[in-house]
Amino acid sequence: MVEINLRELKKYANPFFLTIRKDKILVNNKRMARLSRTKMDKIEEEFGIPVIYSKTYEYVSTKVGRFINKHKIIAPRDIVIVGLSGGKDSLLLLHLLEVYRRKYGIKLIAVTVDVNIGGIRPWKEDTEGVKLIKHHCEMLNVPHIILKNDLDVVELSEILTKHSKGMEFSPCFSCSVIKRHLLGKLAKEIAENENIPYEKVKLAYGHNLDDNSDTILANIFKGERLKFMRPLTRFKYNEVDYQSFKIPLEECIIIRPMLPILERDIIKALEECGIEYYKDKDMCPYSRDRGDSVRRRCHEILEKLEEEIPNIREMVVSSALKTVEYYSKNPYGEDNL
């Protein structure tokens, strides 16, 4: 493990297109990094660590980079708090954002939230999964914070369901509330301590194309309002009422740079780069892969359709976006037919 001297590295490649770890260097864009096999060999010889080129990692990195630029998700000197569960999505996101420390001069902070899921704590500090998370943060030279909350998200959602008329709240809802409460509070504290506008501190989530298309289809199947994830969302201050107490949600900005990326490409990129991720969903009894939820069925339906229509997930998201755009311009549904 070594600390990379950027001045020396620049002799061989453009570090704006490399993900730099202490134990390896990943190539985000071979052409833009100006890398040849000879230069890769020289880097390995001088720094004593492997240079890994993965076509999938390059593809994902390029696509995420274009998505960030198109939607202006990240600005120079932003502070980006990555919600790091250690799973495939958030871990790959952390690696992809590493280059923006050099490109845009951003500051990266990785934060893991230790939530209580009916007595199960997948992100407790002494677990093997969290040790793996800490290892990756150390290799990327990114500060890591663990935020703990003892409230049981299963009990919280039972309270909401009991006091709601005809609505059922899953533990996933209260889990997301706890995470946003803690991450939003941290973002506010950082903005105040740094004396910068809250817009300069952003929360980064690893939601991908599968997540977005599954969500859209599940909402349709449940007869709910059409909801989907956006590249950048501004949230106003809000409170979730749990009867005997309220959980405040601070004003914040959430970014989702991984929205155009398929889950299978995320897994393939990590595998090709030799990056082990925490299978945190195996620890949670309410994850998509367990049970018989509508969301799981929607995932399976789209997975099956992908065999015949490879871009079906992009089409689902595109249709939702076009529908919202249409009705925002035509509130009474006029059509020019």
Curated annotation (Swiss-Prot):
A single GO BP: tRNA wobble position uridine thiolation
UniProt cofactor note: Binds 1 [4Fe-4S] cluster per subunit. The cluster is chelated by three Cys residues.
UniProt organism field: Methanocaldococcus jannaschii (strain ATCC 43067 / DSM 2661 / JAL-1 / JCM 10045 / NBRC 100440) (Methanococcus jannaschii)
UniProt KW ATP-binding keyword: yes
Signal peptide (residue range): none
Lineage: Archaea, Methanobacteriati, Methanobacteriota, Methanomada group, Methanococci
Domain of life: Archaea
Family, per entry: Belongs to the TtcA family.
Annotated Gene3D superfamilies: HUPs
Needed cofactors: [4Fe-4S] cluster; Mg(2+)
Primary enzyme class: transferase
GO function term, MF aspect, one: 4 iron, 4 sulfur cluster binding
UniProt key word Metal-binding: yes
Protein name: Probable sulfurtransferase
Binding locations of ATP: 83, 179, 206
Keyword list, A-Z: 4Fe-4S, ATP-binding, Iron, Iron-sulfur, Metal-binding, Nucleotide-binding, Transferase
A GO CC term attached to the entry: cytosolic tRNA wobble base thiouridylase complex
EC number: 2.8.1.-
Matches recorded under InterPro entries: Rossmann-like_a/b/a_fold, TilS/TtcA_N, tRNA_thiolation_TtcA_Ctu1
Residues binding [4Fe-4S] cluster: 172, 175, 284
Pfam families, per the entry: ATP_bind_3
SUPFAM superfamilies named among the record's database cross-references: Adenine nucleotide alpha hydrolases-like
